[in-house]
Amino acid sequence: MVRLIGLFGAVAFCFSTSAVAQTSDQAVIDQYWARWNDGEGLKLLNHLAKCVAERHPAAADAFVTNTTDATALQKDQEHLVDTGCIKKYWFRTSSTTIDPEAYRPMLAEALLTTSYSSGSIPAVNAVTAELDRPRLPNVPIEKVHPYYRVMFLIDKHNAALAGYSECIVRQQQDAVLALAVTPLNSEEEATALAEIEKASPNCDPYRPDVSFPSYVRRGDLMLQLYSLTRLAGGQVPQSRS
């Protein structure tokens, strides 16, 4: 059985870190995202996302755009975790772990490259609707119960990254889409990300207070771009299988 990380994985992370006193925000973010910074896990997720986007685009679109259902991945494992796709890359499925938070951005990128490989992407800078993302209460961390502080910090900084990414996408959607052709975790990716961020000075007020791995920054840009293209009238790609 393919293992899925969801709410219980996040809770387990809280248990593992909540006892650490005075941990810096950066250390919390580093530890949280380090679980997917091994390269091979990302390659498998990337392969799975591309295969699923081609075989089951409607299911992939529903999962990417529905960020409120924490059990969405479990509900549609047949399509979203297609074992046939996994076996094309890895001969076993029992040891495969899928984290929705890492998988959703990769599916978004795969859907973008499937839908708009010709470059005919809808303009997103005129989309007035706000993207659906968590809105955290504006309270100081000292007011948060110690048990929830780690997840509060993670949600806070992830939300800041989402706002920063959305700002960049609204200004540089073509450059963000071009980022998809760079290999994952490569020098080309790092260079492209740096250039995109440098060319978006108007978004600096939204820049997170902590740094994120390149694959997280890339993924969040792709997630915001896909979400905005759907709001701009972009269509779900058709299955190629």
Listing of model-derived features with the role each one plays in the protein:
Residues 22-119:
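N-terminal Sec/ER secretory leader and immediately downstream segment
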Residues 8-9, 19:
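Cleavable N-terminal signal peptides
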Residues 188-241:
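A cross-kingdom marker for long, charged
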Residues 59-62, 92-101, 175-178, 209-219:
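Extracellular/mature segments of secreted proteins
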Residues 14-18:
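N-terminal signal peptide c-region/cleavage motif recognized by signal peptidases
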Residues 39, 54, 58-65, 152-155, ...:
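Surface-exposed, polar/charged faces of alpha-helical domains
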